[in-house]
Design a protein with these regions (language model features):
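N-terminal amphipathic/basic-hydrophobic helices that include classical n-h-c signal peptides
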Residues: 1-11
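An alpha-helical support segment within catalytic cores of ATP-dependent transferases
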Residues: 9-29, 90-93, 122, 127, ...
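ATP-binding pocket architecture of kinase catalytic cores
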Residues: 34-145
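Active-site acidic catalytic loop and adjacent metal/ATP-binding pocket
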Residues: 43-47, 54, 177-225
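Short glycine/proline-enriched coil/turn segments at helix->beta-strand junctions
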Residues: 49-52, 77-82, 206-209, 232-235, ...
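Glycine-rich, phosphate-binding/catalytic loops in enzymes
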Residues: 117-119, 153, 211, 228-231, ...
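Active-site activation/catalytic loop segments of kinase-like enzymes and analogous catalytic loops
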Residues: 227-269, 282-299
Length: 343
């Protein structure tokens, strides 16, 4: 029975890709080479003539995110550091799915090659990344209540964690105090379009040049929220690597990335409360993971560390502490509870 259903699905997708190809003969030609790519969990993907990628959203639950990616492409038509969008459809009139046709890019993810680069090459790559981010961030969005957004993400997760008895009484006091600082640190006026999933698996490298991929998580948010994933990857590069590339990740290779970002995109790190804001983002991110895996002590420690940064009595700025290693050293000196401002 399962085999029969599977065969029906294969036949259906074969008919759909043939219809898409037929509708786009001016792009593909009359007898194109079609190869199915076995990647992606929510999309079915085909390589056409080794020049184009047809991405079909076969999961209705992912349609909102898929449309985000199409909108992202349409907002960045002149950005040569992302693939080109040739065609897209969300009307389901002729094809019963959302789909897009984009440029196939050559190369490998940065995770595959970062460890082989000299420091000069790494600086050039981050310069290109900064150029790509600047172009993306030139799309200005309307202001909304960012503090409330983060509070509404954090609090239900925190309640779950308390119900699971993850934190002791002293840790809860720390988290409560850090939460009280959200209003102070999260006020934002600089809302732009961001990629929102920037790590090295989503940056492709070929012959000295990079291109960004995977825009389904894109959103309008404060500019520094672009650093949420990126800064976390810099600190723990193995967390975002595939099984194949994890063996190449050495945190020492990532030490200077924030310094290069400051050099080539100073506006991205200009918020005086950057460390506190990134720490709040960490609290939300790791708390979401922790309530799913309450047995993992490392996730709990990550939440607590973020709360300690937010709760520091002597506030730190990016000018004081620029690299993850410097932040760890600073926190090791200021780790006692005397650093919490109880006034």
């Amino acid at each position: 029975m399962y085999a029969l259903i599977k065969n029906e699905e294969v036949t259906k997708m074969h008919e759909i890709i043939n219809k898409i190809v037929q509708q786009n003969q001016s792009l593909f030609g009359t007898n194109p080479k079609i190869d199915k790519i076995n990647i992606g969990f929510t999309n079915t993907i085909y390589n056409i003539n080794d020049l184009y990628i047809v991405k079909i959203c076969t999961d209705e639950d992912n349609e909102k995110e898929f449309k985000k990616e199409i909108d992202f492409y349409n907002s960045n038509k002149n950005n040569n550091l992302i693939p080109k969008l040739y065609c897209s459809s969300i009307n389901k009139k002729d094809v019963p799915y959302f789909y897009e046709i984009i440029e196939k890019i050559d190369g490998v993810s940065l995770y595959n090659v970062w460890h082989t680069f000299s420091e000069e090459q790494r600086e050039d790559i981050i310069k290109q990344l900064c150029d790509a981010m600047k172009q993306i961030h030139s799309n200005i969005g309307e202001k909304y209540d960012w503090t409330k957004t983060m509070q509404e993400k954090f609090m239900p997760l925190y309640i779950q964690a308390k119900n699971l008895n993850i934190f002791n009484e002293e840790e809860q006091k720390l988290l409560d105090y850090a939460y009280s600082k959200f209003n102070k640190y999260l006020d934002s006026n600089d809302f732009v379009l961001i990629h929102n999933d920037l790590h090295f698996d989503n940056i492709f490298y070929n012959d000295g040049k990079i291109k960004l991929i995977d825009f389904e998580r894109s959103m309008y948010a404060p500019r520094d929220f672009e650093l949420d994933i990126l800064y976390r990857m810099i600190r723990k590069p193995w967390k975002f690597a595939s099984e194949e590339t994890e063996r190449y990740t050495d945190s020492g290779d990532y030490t200077n990335i924030m310094l290069y970002i400051e050099k080539y995109y100073p506006e991205l790190v200009s918020n005086p409360n950057l460390h506190q804001r990134l720490a709040i983002y960490d609290m939300v991110y790791f708390l979401e993971q922790l309530v799913k895996h309450p047995e993992l002590e490392e996730l709990k420690n990550d939440v607590i560390f973020g709360a300690k940064v937010v709760a520091l009595k002597d506030e730190i700025t990016f000018n004081d502490v620029k690299t993850p290693m410097e932040l760890m050293d600073f926190m090791n000196v200021n780790i006692e509870y005397g650093w919490i401002d109880n006034q």
